[in-house]
Structure formats: C-alpha cells, structure tokens
Amino acid sequence: EHSSKWLSMCSHSFRVADLDDDGKDEILYGSAAIDDDGSELWCTGNGHGDCLCVGKFIKDRSGLQIVASFEEPGNYNGQGHGYGCQVIDARDGGLITGHGAGSTTDVGRCIVADIDPDSPNFEYWSSLQEGVFSCSGSGLVSSTYPTGIGGGVLYNVAIYWSGQPTREMLDRACVVSYKENPDVNKTNKTRLVYFGTYGSNDGNHSTKYNPCYYGDFLGDYREEVIMGSSDMKSIYIFSTNHPTEFRLPHLMTDHNYDMSQAMQNMGYNQGTNLGYYVGAETLKKAE
C-alpha cells in the first residue's frame, strides 16, 4: 500500500537507473521512485510532468541528478518542492535547485546539457523561459537561449555532434550550436546541419519533432541520428562529418547512457545522458 501522496505521480515517460548507487536499478516513473526490492524509495509530491532526465550533471556532487518539469501547480507548489522545473538528488528526491517558484502554469518542456564551456557543471532551462541556469544552484548562467528555425527556443534533446566536449541541440532535423566555437568555425546558435537537405522529414510528433532514434552507435562518443524520409518510405542514418581530438569510451558501455538511449522513445522522447560527468572543464584533447 502507498500513501495518497504517491497517487498521480507518473510522467509521460519513465527512467530506469541506479538512483541510490547500490549497484541495482530503480524505477523512476515521474515524481516517485521504486527501489530494486519493490519498496518505496522516495516521492516528491511534484505530480505529473512531461520531461524527465537522469544523469551526472554536477561535477563535485556524489551520485546522479534528475532534471524534470511539471504540469500541475497545485501539486508542485503544494505538496511538492515549489518549482515548475527542478534539479533533484536521485538518491533521496531532495531538491537541489529549481526555477519557476510559485508558477501557475504547466511547464511542458525542459532540458539539461553542458552547452556553455565557460560555465562549470551542466545547464538546464525550461519553457518558462526564465533563463539558462546552472544545475549546481549557482544561479542564472545566461538569459540567451539555444534557438532554432524561426528563433524558437530549443528544448528537445542534446547531442554530441561537433566533436567538442559540450553538446549541441537536436530539434526539428537540425543540429544547432549554442556558443561560438572556433574549432568548428561556427558562430553563436549557428545551424551545423539540417537533415532535411538530404531528404529526411522534420521528425516525429508535430509538437516535438523528435528523431526516430539517436545515440552513439559507432562507438566514437559522437552520436548518430535516425530519421524517416520526407516521403515516409525510407530510413536515414546520419553521422557527423566533424573530426574530434577528444576521446571517450563507447557511450553505450555506460549503464546509465545505455538505459537512457534504450528508453528514449518510451512515452514522450527524452534525450541520452551519461552516468559519469563529462563537461568542458574535464574532457581534454587526446595527446
């Protein structure tokens, strides 16, 4: 039996990960987690949400972190942590930081990634459009967002594409960089590639435009993208043409990443995330 607080806590997706670092997986089905023995691990009371990410987002904090956004102000402001978008400790469900305090709206989208090489730890932002924040709780990183076609803010998924330690945004068949990067000769928020040029469609689901699938299939840490064709008759697999001087093991050898890629289209699509920390301040060029 569960207390009434556990009712209606599920999200439009769920994650399987070793939340409490005991060598066994737990089930995170939204605002609550079930331990490996079937018992209650924790419940935040935040209620239902659309976005749910689990990974290592804070370099010097032990364990994994969760970034999630929530639909129901009555829950996340009432019995929950009080923010529309939150960074949560995966071990106990405790609040690390958040934004959208006292929000009265459905926060339908959020994303987490290391997109700014000048800011330590990962960044996260949401459809509240209050800014790009640090997962560590150190506050606002920037009021400038990753933007795509037509200037819309990007919340879809993050991808290793350009061969850099930071990630780019993958949204509506486009890979877009955030900050100027002379190593790939691109400027702020410049489109790196549009897969539609080669015959793909813009993605699945007209409000999200997700790829069919993406991940590190070839084993060189840069990720490949699977898209349907514009005529819906073919499947395309795209691989980056950007060289890299950085080296990482095949990302799918990391259990957290492997689970995240396997579950990315179980419900609403969620991006891939590693279970160990890789950021611009830690990943060095190969000698």
For each of these PLM feature ranges, what is it?
Residues 1-287:
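Beta-propeller-forming repeat regions
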